[in-house]
Amino acid sequence: MSTPSRFKKDKEIIAEYESQVKEIRAQLVEQQKCLEQQTEMRVQLLQDLQDFFRKKAEIETEYSRNLEKLAERFMAKTRSTKDHQQFKKDQNLLSPVNCWYLLLNQVRRESKDHATLSDIYLNNVIMRFMQISEDSTRMFKKSKEIAFQLHEDLMKVLNELYTVMKTYHMYHSESISAESKLKEAEKQEEKQIGRSGDPVFHIRLEERHQRRSSVKKIEKMKEKRQAKYSENKLKSIKARNEYLLTLEATNASVFKYYIHDLSDLIDCCDLGYHASLNRALRTYLSAEYNLETSRHEGLDIIENAVDNLEPRSDKQRFMEMYPAAFCPPMKFEFQSHMGDEVCQVSAQQPVQAELMLRNQQLQSRLATLKIESEEVKKTTEATLQTIQDMVTIEDYDVSECFQHSRSTESVKSTVSETYLSKPSIAKRRANQQETEQFYFMKLREFLEGSNLITKLQAKHDLLQRTLGEGHRAEYMTTSRGRRNSHARHQDSGQVIPLIVESCIRFINLYGLQHQGIFRVSGSQVEVNDIKNSFERGENPLSDEQSNHDINSVAGVLKLYFRGLENPLFPKERFTDLISCIRIDNLYERALHIRKLLLTLPRSVLIVMRYLFAFLNHLSQYSDENMMDPYNLAICFGPTLMPVPEIQDQVSCQAHVNEIVKTIIIHHETIFPDAKELDGPVYEKCMAGGDYCDSPYSEHGTLEEVDQDAGTEPHTSEDECEPIEAIAKFDYVGRSARELSFKKGASLLLYHRASEDWWEGRHNGIDGLVPHQYIVVQDMDDTFSDTLSQKADSEASSGPVTEDKSSSKDMNSPTDRHSDSYLARQRKRGEPPPPGRRPGRTSDGHCPLHPPHALSNSSIDLGSPNLASHPRGLLQNRGLNNDSPERRRRPGHGSLTNISRHDSLKKIDSPPIRRSTSSGQYTGFNDHKPLDPETIAQDIEETMNTALNELRELERQSTVKHAPDVVLDTLEQVKNSPTPATSTESLSPLHNVALRGSEPQIRRSTSSSSETMSTFKPMVAPRMGVQLKPPALRPKPAVLPKTNPTMGPAAPSQGPTDKSCTM
């Protein structure tokens, strides 16, 4: 009984699907018929226009009686058509048909003829209509080819859905069958067990053997059916997932075709038709206006209708005339099979890894396709604009023919010399057809690419929702630093308005990488709240814990400039600024704009300089935020430079956008600097309420650095004693450069290659060893905690001022990369995680720390002397914060304060010991040693603090469980939000979200007020508790070849280049 009902169920589902596909196929055929009918109507209309002007030219010398007969003839002809009756009933005429009717009405008013007018009709207007008719037919044929291609693609998608649906039905049926067989085997096993419970002393020996063998057979059969059921169940889940993904992609493709592609196809059919018809009729109008001024009233009506020749409105009317053909169909719904209640993509454990891999592949593929599609789209739009320029050329004015009293022959020669010149026509037509061919080729490429993007995006979005990875945005808005206590006082009369400065500062801190900023609108309610707060004299953006939406803050900034009574660019300068477009050389154009803007008031010029410097900085992140100078100009052009009402809004807006784009790109050339114009200047590097200088600022040349710190001691690799380490977890190297080892293996470490890697040896092989997978034997008690606590010891020494370090101290595993490699890393680097920025120093530059060296003394818990070891020198060697890599990457100078190790540790776990750096003290920039008493006092305080923390650690270790690097971090993030005044690490999920799929260059700027990102020893776990491997595997560093005469690479507290680590 189950088999017939199952087949009946399958047939019903398939029949319903085939019926829906059949309706779509019929709809596609009907659409093609409608387009063909539209083209035939246009050709017939153009033929009528040709006949009309030909007849009108023949009887132009007759009296008004003959003209009236002509008008009546064509009016009767149009009234007899079926389409005319429909148009008359609906009162919804297409703009070309409306022009045709008004033209016939105008003919009734004509009462006079002229030879010049007859010549213009025969040799100018009729030829235009012939060309329009040819163009319309050609456009329709090319559009028809694209339509057939789109129809085939759509049917392929529907067939694919049909195949996937049947596959899903088949696997689900097999799963149900396997389940029933498994249940049957279980019942047989239960029966056999029941029999085996009978007393065995009444059973003969032969029967006992038979029962045992039957029990074994039933058990084997049950195991086979259990395996078969599991296999079929997995296949059913995968088939259902594939069905749901294909279903989502199919619905997206169908929706895109009906909403976007159909509109584009109709535009292709209309390409140049209205514009060319506009030109032909304007030629007629020009002749009529010069022939007799008494006919102006009637001709004004026709001119108004010609001006209303609008392809968009005609397209809307045309689609409304045939709603059944152009209405999008209903979305395909998921058809559950045999009581299957799961209607979503399943992310269960057997398929979760596969779905995550597929999601990553889709994301990577989509990123590439979107870039390619955007480039093709720009090319298509530029080509379309070229075609529109060709078909909208204003060559319809024939007023020159009526300026003097001439004979018919002279008029004919004049006309033929202008528009009808054969070489001119041939060249123009050839250019137009060549451009049209290129346009259709690019349009086809764009439509095919966008179709693929639509399908992949639909699958990606569904997988993203299923896997629950859509929360990256909230991590990107975490606090990036604490507010400087010396924030500058701003009164109500400040040069830069408070609302402008606060919005720009907020975007600088939290929104430089925000995709679609200024283009995506924010919440209107939030925008009004922020605006009202500023109007009350408050600053709602001063609180760094505020969770305002970036799009809303950007909307407030645009709303402020839009609401100015006097625009930032005065209306009196609008014409002069627009005229700069004629200058092709961008640098000369910028100089011309500079001359015009220097005439503006000083206050306006300062605000302009501040705003456009910010927009230029924002455009440097166009790879992340998708807002290049052109897109920013589109958003700010209408706001900063509104087009006067007397100007053409459409044509002028493109020129306005080009002017604003030029100012954004060449703002440094256009606006005077701080020496020429005193006033606030936009700072790229902002922290809290204060700012520090741009990362481009120079702290001295490399030669100066060498001279100032040339006496820094070095330690070569030969002088280093190997360190012994024990593996905490199993590790398999991902390349020949990485070492593989088992848990508990002994390794020898030579020196630290980066924050995540060691150079070491295992089983006679040299290579890289990941720091998180090992326990360093003699480093846990000396230098690991020393590095992690160096900032605490530096904080007690007073403010840190600018200093220079030797170029020899800039030895980092990634410092000597080639420029081309760094350039590639900068291009594809993702936005770094937010971290604290250093406070501003007295001279206006970001503070720069000198390297720290350890003295050659020993240390124990009872002595204030400091430890000394060659490895200490290697680990304490600094890196110049103002390295060329850092200067080349603006806005990222302070973002490496959060390291991988910090993100994997408990926030509240105290360090084992504090240690201070001896030798060159970080509190001074003149390389002078401290007073011995001061050093002794500082060391004593540090050691007392370390002892107290050791006692506290011992107390906590008896209560708390061993830390789990994943669960503990997640629990802290969930229960205790990160305060704005700390640089505690984010959760591992945050690191995953920030790092994405590409490595990035991470740098930091040392500060006396912030915690250093260094290597802290983890708390030893309790006995019996098994540690887990790190949540994230470090990406191997690409190490350059070291010079034997140079010291080995060492980690630094400066801006370590993390471009090669994960």
Curated annotation (Swiss-Prot):
Residues 481-671 form the Rho-GAP domain. The record marks 519 as: Arginine finger. Residues 1004-1013 have a biased composition (Low complexity). Keywords: Coiled coil, GTPase activation, Phosphoprotein, SH3 domain. GO terms for molecular function: GTPase activator activity; small GTPase binding. Residues 899-908 have a biased composition (Basic and acidic residues). Residues 785-931, 974-1013, 1028-1062 are annotated as: Disordered. Transmembrane segments: none annotated. The modification Phosphoserine is found at residues 416, 812, 894, 909, 976, 1009. Residues 19-314 form the F-BAR domain. Residues 785-799, 914-923, 974-988, 1053-1062 have a biased composition (Polar residues). Disulfide bonds: none annotated. One of its GO terms (biological process) is Rho protein signal transduction. Residues 352-382, 933-960 form a coiled coil. InterPro entries: AH/BAR_dom_sf, F_BAR, FCH_dom, Rho_GTPase_activation_prot, RhoGAP_dom, SH3-like_dom_sf, SH3_domain, SLIT-ROBO_RhoGAP. The modification Phosphothreonine is found at residue 978. GTPase-activating protein for RhoA and Cdc42 small GTPases. Together with CDC42 seems to be involved in the pathway mediating the repulsive signaling of Robo and Slit proteins in neuronal migration. SLIT2, probably through interaction with ROBO1, increases the interaction of SRGAP1 with ROBO1 and inactivates CDC42. The F-BAR domain mediates oligomerization, binds membranes, and constrains plasma membrane protrusions. PANTHER family: SLIT-ROBO RHO GTPASE ACTIVATING PROTEIN. This is SLIT-ROBO Rho GTPase-activating protein 1. It comes from Mus musculus (Mouse). The lineage of its organism: Eukaryota, Metazoa, Chordata, Craniata, Vertebrata.
